[in-house]
Amino acid sequence: MGNIIDETKPVAQTRQMFGRRIIKTSVKEITRENVGDVLRKAMSTHSLNRSEIEYLWDYYKGKQPILNRTKDVRPEITNRIVENRANEIVSFKVGYLCGEPIQYVGKNGSEEITQGITRLNELMFAEDKAAQDQEIVEWQMICGTAYRLVLPDNRGEEDEAPFELYTLDPRDSFVVYSTEIGNKPLMGVKYCVDDNNITHYSIYTDTMYYLLDGDTIVEESPNPLGAIPIFEYPANNARLGSFEIVLPLLDTLNNITSNRMDGIEQIVQAFIKFINCDISKEEYEEFLKLGAIKVKSVDGTTADVGVVTTSLDQTQTQTLKEDCYNAILTICGIPNRNGGSSTSDTGAAVLL
C-alpha cells in the first residue's frame, strides 16, 4: 500500500514524496523467456517513479500547487504567485558542481599512461561530455537520479570519438537491479511511445539486446559490448531531489506571498460602508466616476461613509517569510546570499 499514489488529495495540496524507488528483481539472469515478465513488474514500480519525476520536473519549471489555489471569501481577489525557489536551488547546485569540466588524471606518471589519459580527455571533449555532465547533474538535483547511454558510433557515422554519449530522460529510462548481495544491474531499459500509441522498449543486458513492441519481442541480438550501456547516477542513496525535502516549505512560501498580495489588494479594493444613509446603484457609480460622495445627516442621526478594511501586519509577515526561506537554505545546504547568520558560509562549507 505504501507505493500507491493518493489521487484523492486536492491538486493545491503539497504532494508527499520520499525519493525514487530502486527497481529490483529476484531472477538471476534476464533471458528471452523471462524478459517480458521482468519488464512488466519493473514498469509497475517505474510508473510510480515516473509520476513523481513528472511532478518534480513541472515544479522546477514553475507549475506548482499554488496555481490551483482557491478562496471562499472574496474569490475575485485570489493571487497565485509562484516564487520559484526550487529553480534557484537546482541552478545553484548545478552551477556549483559543474563549474569546471571533469578532467581525468592518473597516479602513475609513466609516459604511456599519461598519453592515454590525454587521449581520453580529448575524446570526452570531442563528445562535449561537459554539457552532458551538466544535464546529468540537473536531473539529479531535480528528481534524485539520472541516466546515461553510451553506444559505439554507427557504421559510416564515425567521428573523432568511437562512441556516442546520450543523457536519457529518467521519465522513460530505468535500470533493474538484482536483489542479491551487491545489487548487480541486470538490465537497462529505454522506451518510447509512437504515434500509434505502441510502446517500444529497448532492453540491454550484459549479453543481449531485446526490442519489444508492447509484450512482443520483435528483435533480439547479442550485445557485443559485454556490459549494460545504460548507467544510473543516483544523487544519493534515497534518490532524493535537491528541493524535494523542502516541498512543504516551498509551498508555504508561495502561500505567504500570494496571501500578502491578497491583503494589499483587499485594502485597495475595500468595501465601502454607508452609515445612516441610502444611495442608489446609479448614484454610487456616478460618485465613483467623480471621485467623491456627498451624504447628508437627517433626523438627528449622523451619516457617514467609510471603508471596511482589515490590515495585514507586513512586519510579522516578512518575518515569517524570511524564517521559511532561511529554513529552506539551511536544509538544502545553500549559503544565504542576502545576509543573516549564514552569510560567512561558503558553498563548500555548507555542503560539507
Short names for language-model regions:
Residues 134-143, 147-239:
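Extended, regular secondary-structure scaffolds
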Residues 218-352:
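Extended, charged amphipathic alpha-helical segments
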Residues 70, 74, 81, 86-89, ...:
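Intrinsic disorder/low-complexity detector
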Residues 42-43, 78-79, 83, 129-138, ...:
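Intrinsically disordered, low-complexity boundary segments flanking structured domains
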Residues 1-163:
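Extended, helix-rich architectural segments
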Residues 17, 34, 60, 93, ...:
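Intrinsically disordered, low-complexity segments enriched in small/polar residues
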Residues 29-40, 61-77, 83, 87-88, ...:
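Short charge-dense sequence patches
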